[in-house]
């Protein structure tokens, strides 16, 4: 697909590959190709991560937020995030619908981010 959001992911992938050449990074690819081996083999043959991706990068905060909330609610799992990276200081965002557990988890991550600075 060709659009502005896809172009953002392509550029981010290229930049990430330059910054971390020893890390297996690939993209842009659809979520099913990134997560399901049989789909990855047909949609992204030759990709080192197709079907076994452990990090997904979204083109915007909004898209990432929608995606993680869908997975959290449909699968009935505990999800922590969104975790923001690349800021001058540790900062993360809590949803108005978050639980006490969500707050504790994200505070712990933010404290670890601050300690690493």
Map each language-model feature to its residues:
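Glycine-rich phosphate/diphosphate-binding loop of Rossmann-like nucleotide-binding domains
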Residues: 1-28, 32
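Alpha-helix capping and helix-loop boundary segments enriched in small/acidic/polar residues
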Residues: 3-4, 44, 94-98
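Glycine-rich, charged/polar anion/phosphate-binding loops
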Residues: 37-45
């Amino acid at each position: 697909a060709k659009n502005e959001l896809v172009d953002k992911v392509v550029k981010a992938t290229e930049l990430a590959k330059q910054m971390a050449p020893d890390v297996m990074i690939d993209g842009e690819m659809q979520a099913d190709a990134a997560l399901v081996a049989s789909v990855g083999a047909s949609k992204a043959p030759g990709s080192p991560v197709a079907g076994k991706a452990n990090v997904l990068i979204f083109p915007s905060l909004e898209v990432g937020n929608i995606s993680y909330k869908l997975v959290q609610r449909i699968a009935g799992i505990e999800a922590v995030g969104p975790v923001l990276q690349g800021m001058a200081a540790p900062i993360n965002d809590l949803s108005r619908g978050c639980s006490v557990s969500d707050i504790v988890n994200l505070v712990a991550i933010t404290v670890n981010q601050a300690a690493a600075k």
